[in-house]
Amino acid sequence: MNSSNLENLNYKSSIRDEVVPSRKKLTLPPWLEVAKPRLIPLLLATTLGGMALTEEWPLSSPKLICTLGGGALAAAAAGALNCLWEMELDKRMTRTSKRALPAGKLSSETVFLAAVSCTLAASMLLVSGVNYLAAGLTLLGLFSYVILYTVILKPRTTKNIVFGGVAGAIPPLVGASAATGHVGLSGWWLFGLVMLWTPAHFWALAILLKDDYASVGIPMLPSVKGSVFTAKAISRYGWATVLMSIMGVFALPEGGLLYGIMLLPFNGRLLQLINELKKSPDDLSRAKSLFRWSILYMFGICLLLLISRTQLSVEFEQQSMQIFLSIVSLLSN
């Protein structure tokens, strides 16, 4: 290997270390590591978003705690089963070889029993404290992540995250069903938004890790089609995400005006980063920036949904309508 190639690999490695939380920088106990706790907060945020889209918001504290607690336990179980299934694959990748299972810090039996225990606990909590539909949807999300994405799609197709993203899009349905006992159109809107957001979000990370995926034969889009093709795909899904996010103005029972106004800078920044990556698809720092912002973007959307259901938002809409009617009255005279 010549010096230029070595420098390029070192550069990519340093960028990856900045994007993917390093075990050297943040060491988790083995039992917590396999639960993939970094993924759970965003899943719970979209669950809250699904709740905020219903007329029943805010929920009672017991139901809220049971919904979020059950969701966290199910997500932990899904993470553990994912680690268990991919243990041999992780051993072959430098980035993942020191994880708890491939490094032998935990036994397969222990992780499997923990996953089953978390699944049972989540089911009991949701059935007893929420409702059967919320419990069933949560288990469907777990099944989708472990079986549909991890086992079936991930090792077989570049569209793995497009269809496998359904697992990450189910929490809004759980939130809506927890609040009302059914899933309305607003809940399906947030489901669709997460589905469209997921490929653009994940492919930005996959650009940084494309060599790792290629080395073990995982057909992630950047590894198979290259960064240029992937950046164009990210752009398409990014624009679709922006257009879908605007529909939230109509999905909210109230507060849509404030949501729409506060949404503008989020969408503007997302499109800016997507455009920058499209211009320089091999620039890992741009992929890193887009990946990071995409996470903040979805957290931001959920926060906007919650803010839009406050009394402040209702008063803002009322005052805005009064100002609008006053302007119309002045112009008509």
Swiss-Prot record:
Describe the family membership recorded for this protein in Swiss-Prot or TrEMBL.
Belongs to the UbiA prenyltransferase family. Protoheme IX farnesyltransferase subfamily.
Per UniProt, the keywords (alphabetical) are: Cell inner membrane, Cell membrane, Heme biosynthesis, Membrane, Transferase, Transmembrane, Transmembrane helix
Gene name as annotated:
ctaB
Membrane-crossing residue ranges in chain numbering: 64-84, 110-130, 133-153, 161-181, 189-209, 246-266, 287-307
Q: Which organism is it from?
A: Prochlorococcus marinus (strain AS9601)
According to UniProt, the name of this protein is Protoheme IX farnesyltransferase
Q: What else is known?
A: Carbon 2 of the heme B porphyrin ring is defined according to the Fischer nomenclature.
Q: Which CDD domains match?
A: PT_UbiA_Cox10
Report which reactions are catalysed by this protein. Answer: heme b + (2E,6E)-farnesyl diphosphate + H2O = Fe(II)-heme o + diphosphate
Q: Which GO terms of the cellular component aspect does the record hold?
A: plasma membrane
One GO BP on record is: heme O biosynthetic process
